Amino acid sequence: MAIAESFQLSDGYSVYAGVRARRDGVVEDAAFALAKIGGTDGTSAASKILEALLRRDVSLVMLDGCIVSFYNWVDGEALYAKFKKPVACYVFEEPEGRVEEAVRKLFTDWEVRIEAIKKLGPPTVYYTKSGYKIYIRAWGIDPVDAGRAAEYCTGFGKIPEPLRVAKIIAGAARQFLKTLGKFRFLW
């Protein structure tokens, strides 16, 4: 299972998409949720998707990043505690520094945000057999095993197929909502 998001700062909201996929990457179902850009509701959006899609046979929840949509975040540990399924957060580019500095400047609730971001812990670097570097945070599963799981369902490149598909449909859903002209009225 995989959850990814798509946003533009001007939208004010991020569209989260989740897909339930088999180990071979074949997608069986999808669900959507919204979160505020720069908000604190990323974990809630991911939780709504899990409530819609999770089954007993799901063995891993893959997240496309933990710090998302302009310093919103998804708390993998909270998802693991609530749903009793291993959760792994993947970042496919080297994480940019100075997150704390930016959060202090941008948000009045910066202390809460920094605490939540620190709670995520540092990522573990995983090197794929094809030479790609993936940064992984994991709960309920060893980060190396989470890296192997990602590699198993990666057809080409470095992004696992379920995350790639979730990212594509999140972007398509965001564009669709904008086309409807109702995007601003959803909240």
From Swiss-Prot:
What does UniProt give as the signal peptide span?
none
InterPro entries from the entry?
A: Endo_dU (IPR002802)
Any Pfam family matching the protein: DUF99
Domain of life, source organism: Archaea
Q: To which protein family does this belong?
A: Belongs to the UPF0215 family.
- Tell me what this protein is called: UPF0215 protein PAE0952
Give the organism the record lists.
Pyrobaculum aerophilum (strain ATCC 51768 / DSM 7523 / JCM 9630 / CIP 104966 / NBRC 100827 / IM2)
